[in-house]
Amino acid sequence: NSSSLARDNYREFLDLVSGDPVLRAEAMRRLGDLELEATEAAQLGENIDALATDSYDSAVGLYQQLLEAYPDYRRNDTVLYQLARAYEIGGLTDDALTTLDELVARFPDTPFIDEVQFRRGEMLFLRKRYNDAELAYVAVIDFGDESKFYEQSLYKLGWSRFKLAWHEDSLEPFFDLLDRKIGDFDLKEGEARLAGLSRAEQELVEDTFRFLSISFSYMGGAEGIDRFLATRGNPVYSYIIYRNLGDLYLSKERFVDAAETYEAFVKHDPLHPKAPLLQVEVIEAYEQGGFPTLVLDGKKAFVERYGMDGEFWVRNPVDENQAVAAHLKANLSDLAEYYHAKAQTGGDRQDYREAAGWYRKFLAYFPDEPDSANTNFLLAEILFESEDFFAATDEYERTAYAYPMHEKSAEAGYAALLAYQEHEQTLQGAEKTAWHQQYLDSGLRFADTYPEHPESGAVLTTVAEELFADNQFDLAIAVGQAVVGKQPPVEPTLMRTAWTVIAHSQFDLANFVEAEQAYYSLQNYTPPDDPEARTEIRERIASSIYKQGEAARAAGDLETAVGHFTRLGTVVPD
């Protein structure tokens, strides 16, 4: 093949230039390179005996002879480099390291000094000679970031210093590496930008973060991070460092340490877009550890820091932080439900106030959410249970009438009436009168809005009675008519009450014709076994007919008057 032919040609050429040291040295180097390439090609072809071939021995021998015979050859740095490679290929790593050491000592300015130092660093690191490895990696970094070994050397420099227990000194190269790889990340790009790195770059970044977690765990945990960042500044990825350390503690079931680490970042940079999500991690760590009181405190801290009226939302638009808003809702609901249940169990007034406060915050922050109506109902319930009937009335009515129809709408409207009645018992005089009128208005609104509610007829009937008692006869009649006109019909006892209101109101308004007809209807709903009531109705009918006769006589219509008086004896013979 062409490689074999080229090697044969160089061997012949060596014989021809035996008297010319320059050409002979160049030919020896080139032949050595070809022999080494042939060895590598055989290895790639999975020839396990490749190192036992003449090519390998020839390459090593040529490089050694060249270095010995021509110590001043201008490319001896390359020869040493190739000889070190040959030793490494042959598994003679001690010889390879010795050769690289010689190269560094003799040719410190060789163009590939960065690669040489990196390879030395790798060999020294494997031999646990961390001091020497550290110096080798520093040399690569001093070469400059144009070296393709620069980033890997930053990584291994950090590890070398860590192995030497130089924990704080080990951090700088790791942070320098992260600054290069993700220091310009826009948080909005987040994971998508990280996913855009090559597989090798992703692994390098992930390994670096893992190391930092281990290193900071040796440096006092979150306090160590705080101290370091106080001198270096706060990189865009700092939240990942706190989060990863917290995750490390969590994996070891060090729940309090995990929570305190997450919270350290929140305290360090509370307005950072990721801070609320780490506050969530605080809560979850305490939950996993079984610390209910600390869970409660964590939820309160979340709401206090990230309520919708806080500075966080000035800097971080809601539409870009929907997850934070969702956690805020969940924590508000959890706090309200916790204190509501606690109040119902223990009856402590402070727990009632606490529950109401969290419900009110939820409604203030999320007034138009689908579950806001139900939350408003729960607020009204806690107020009623705590006997704050005045406030309960307002919240029940808001629940019933201020939202689109929902499953608690009608129940809230009816509950408002109960709250009205309870609060009225605490009032007197004009204040009580005004409140009672509001109660009647609310009753009418309830019956009109929720005619299908099982209590709608009873509410209307009660309102009709109350209006009659207040001498509001026209309105009492209208409400009574609404009761008797309901479909399906209300129960007979309510019909009886409604017709009583209608008939008496018409009579008191001197509408005796209408009163008479209403009393006939009332008679239909008065049971036969209530003779006293039936007697009263007959007397009312008689009075209505008599009053019609009197009215006709006063108007000069004697014929009509006589008809009424005559009819009186027929309709009410006794």
What are the functions of these language-model segments?
Residues 1-574:
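Acidic, polar-rich low-complexity tracts and alpha-helical solenoid repeat scaffolds
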